[in-house]
């Protein structure tokens, strides 16, 4: 999003002051929504931040502290408003791993009770993967996750210093992970949803980490998507701000993501059917990567314009193992 010039901001502030003085601030101007996107090392992850002119609210922390610090630096270059809170949309590492950076600034962290409760288990699972399997980190270099400071259940309204409000909604369905918060900018109806939506971008198909196991819930993901239009009711121009990809109007974003998930599941089902007796190879660490790559190729072929096809290869194991589970019982 293009940043206004200082001259324009000054004019807007003067206008807002006049309005506040003559109309008792009943028509306060909306703040500004910004998006920071990490580099490839951070998986091209979006963090959305909202500046109401008096304070900044950040949604999702990024994967490692160095990238979170780059986010903070970007914010501080663009506004003098202090960062006062960081909201976690769901329990995935790129949403909570770098909370420490924001806590050091005095910002308060917020997540649903369910998301906060899930974080330790997800952290243990991912820490083991990145240190012991991927060997991309050591125990010392992998982010030390700090606890969420404030929790809520169901819904919560946050009144900003400007008088504007943000609404938090805990979806009834699990969504992309085991629990999902949607942050609504109440002035505009824009919805910030983390990886629940990746418009024009491939999805993360691992599922939530539950009891130490990847547990995708495609029906629950689609059900979560169906909840979004009602949250933006009365705001026909509202967009969905997902964890990666582009930002589309709510109806379009929901339809596109739902169609993608349906196709992804169909591709996996078809591949497993053709694989036949070789399905056991999907449980063999030495052989499964070839199959994951083949599924990635099929899904990438179905969506040739979508970015980040590698996300499929990294994450589809969760969906594959879920599909295989009934046959193994």
Describe the role of every protein-language-model region.
Residues 1-29:
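Gram-negative bacterial Sec-dependent N-terminal signal peptides
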Residues 116-172, 177-179, 187, 223-233:
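Metallo-beta-lactamase
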